[in-house]
Amino acid sequence: MVHLKTLAGSAVFASLATAAVLPRQSASLNDLFVAAGKSYFGTCSDQALLQNSQNEAIVASQFGVITPENSMKWDALEPSQGNFGWSGADYLVDYATQHNKKVRGHTLVWHSQLPSWVSSIGDANTLRSVMTNHINEVVGRYKGKIMHWDVVNEIFNEDGTFRNSVFYNLLGEDFVRIAFETARAADPDAKLYINDYNLDSASYAKTQAMASYVKKWLAEGVPIDGIGSQAHYSSSHWSSTEAAGALSSLANTGVSEVAITELDIAGAASSDYLNLLNACLNEQKCVGITVWGVSDKDSWRASDSPLLFDGNYQPKDAYNAIVNALS
């Protein structure tokens, strides 16, 4: 979530392009998106935000899926070897269960927010054992409670080569197969995703690498169900046609589904949000959208005001435009 692409406000299809901004309506984003043929409209959260009454009220009323922003990352769950801390993740999963929400698990294998005891491992067999044990413990604990798992996250550089990480350095690209096969065995019913950012143009080297490797891994029997495009955008200069084309190119790899997994857009222009909404609506395999937070004040990009609710938890024009477009 470092390099942010930009999105141009080019034409969206007619029913969305003409959408006027309306006052906030009672129907939830999730209900409206499901009525439009998709599986969910979600957000990210964690225990502290779910205990914030203003934030929680919006999560409860607007979204159908919750992604843990940080509580399921390796440093949160297993800060020292074999010592798991489940309280934050348990809280989120329990909240989702009690409020009839689903959960996207995020993330099992990632180079960042990785404890030093893992990143300093120097032996391939040790790392393989540590990685498979971590996946088995985490996925096994929440078996049957997680809709999607982001199994591997941000594994490519911008030029399409593999990112320098302890996983790739010791195990080569085989760490991807090991991670997915382990996750599949631990919970056969969860959809398994590979997730990354800057997958925003079909001609971009990173997008092409993702598509090429996923096709290769699927042909080799690696159980990848979906590709997640994070969609952290900057201002209005990136072609929405390219964004839609990129989503299509990911869908055409042979995966069963794709999703927009961490959406936020600097400035939160209504036209930009509608363009991404439209890209998912027009791609049959796009099952849903997750926005990366509720209120601008709690965003990792707070100064960019990138979300659908302002710092006072009030709906912004982009929220109203989405509701109107889907109504």
Swiss-Prot record:
SMART domains: Glyco_10. It comes from the Eukaryota. Optimum pH is 4.9. SUPFAM superfamilies: (Trans)glycosidases. Pathway: Glycan degradation; xylan degradation. It is found in: Secreted. It catalyses: Endohydrolysis of (1->4)-beta-D-xylosidic linkages in xylans. It is an enzyme of class 3 (hydrolase). Residues 44-325 form the GH10 domain. The keyword Cell membrane does not apply. Optimum temperature is 52 degrees Celsius. GO terms for biological process: xylan catabolic process. Residues 1-24 form the signal peptide. Keywords: Carbohydrate metabolism, Disulfide bond, Glycosidase, Hydrolase, Polysaccharide degradation, Pyrrolidone carboxylic acid, Secreted, Signal, Xylan degradation. One of its GO terms (cellular component) is extracellular region. Pfam families: Glyco_hydro_10. Endo-1,4-beta-xylanase involved in the hydrolysis of xylan, a major structural heterogeneous polysaccharide found in plant biomass representing the second most abundant polysaccharide in the biosphere, after cellulose. This is Endo-1,4-beta-xylanase C. It comes from Emericella nidulans (strain FGSC A4 / ATCC 38163 / CBS 112.46 / NRRL 194 / M139) (Aspergillus nidulans). The gene is xlnC.
